[in-house]
């Protein structure tokens, strides 16, 4: 039976009790409105820990002024059932006052230079500062041995890895594979914003990522690969924020096409902003 906690002292008592028994504890942070991708992270965490805590907190500091904080989908009953079925042991439900006791305006910010300043960092200024700030607080509250994040948010995972290394958090960071719909669309809590007409078109993002990989692999110049990807998305009806090929650390690759790379796309379809990536 999953335990639901809203009090920080109760959470710490539970986790400390587990640790006194010599058990490893994992954290799966979420913003709720959960889907199969989130539950796969719980199952991944379970492979590396004896107990799994998932948090649901819609974090106001990672939303920009014109973004969807107020209307972000909240589905608490379904989330609880899904987490229990996935094998989660405890659900941590902090409120804003617990997460930001001095208020969000006085919250001590955390910025991960470099990796958080490009791509999503350019499109959504301050977003990753909010992510780092809330994740660091969750780490301090739960004090896990392991934490799992999805690779769909590739840059977010890179930012968190940098923060953990730089601030010496004694936490192993796991990256969970992207879970996709049958047509290739990466599962996302924001997919429900898509209209019935937009939903089939949205799968073009994954198709374009595959084209980017294949084109780059045969030696097509990176700029040409990126331009072709943007054009294909625009022709399908997207407004493109970026379609790029990067090295795993998100720096720009040189002239060589060997080694590991990642293609990343962010684009809007109607009012819905979608992100996806493909490692190769």
Swiss-Prot record:
Binding locations of ATP: 31-38, 150-153, 179, 187-190
Cross-referenced Pfam families: Pantoate_ligase
Active site: 38
Alphabetical keyword list: ATP-binding, Cytoplasm, Ligase, Nucleotide-binding, Pantothenate biosynthesis
InterPro entries: Pantoate_ligase, Pantoate_ligase_C, Rossmann-like_a/b/a_fold
Pathway: Cofactor biosynthesis; (R)-pantothenate biosynthesis; (R)-pantothenate from (R)-pantoate and beta-alanine: step 1/1
Functional summary from the UniProt entry: Catalyzes the condensation of pantoate with beta-alanine in an ATP-dependent reaction via a pantoyl-adenylate intermediate.
Protein name, UniProt field: Pantothenate synthetase
Organism from which the protein derives: Xanthomonas oryzae pv. oryzae (strain MAFF 311018)
